[in-house]
Amino acid sequence: MKAQELRNKNVEELNAELINLLGEQFKLRMQAATGQLQQTHQLKQVRRSIAQVKTVLTEKAGE
């Protein structure tokens, strides 16, 4: 998701997105630990998405 799309969301939607991404990250990490993860780039994508959401939440907290 692009940063501008994230900035258009409200705080509740961003928190829901963050919880969703953290759950997805957990699933991917478990798959990687058991050797079932085929597309390892997904871990990086999810980690960056989490960082983007947290950044936008911090920006909104400062407003």
Swiss-Prot record:
It comes from the Bacteria. GO terms for cellular component: cytosolic large ribosomal subunit. One of its GO terms (biological process) is translation. InterPro entries: Ribosomal_protein_uL29 (IPR050063), Ribosomal_uL29 (IPR001854), Ribosomal_uL29_CS (IPR018254), Ribosomal_uL29_sf (IPR036049). Keywords: Ribonucleoprotein, Ribosomal protein. GO terms for molecular function: structural constituent of ribosome. The keyword Acetylation does not apply. Belongs to the universal ribosomal protein uL29 family. This is Large ribosomal subunit protein uL29. It comes from Actinobacillus pleuropneumoniae serotype 5b (strain L20).
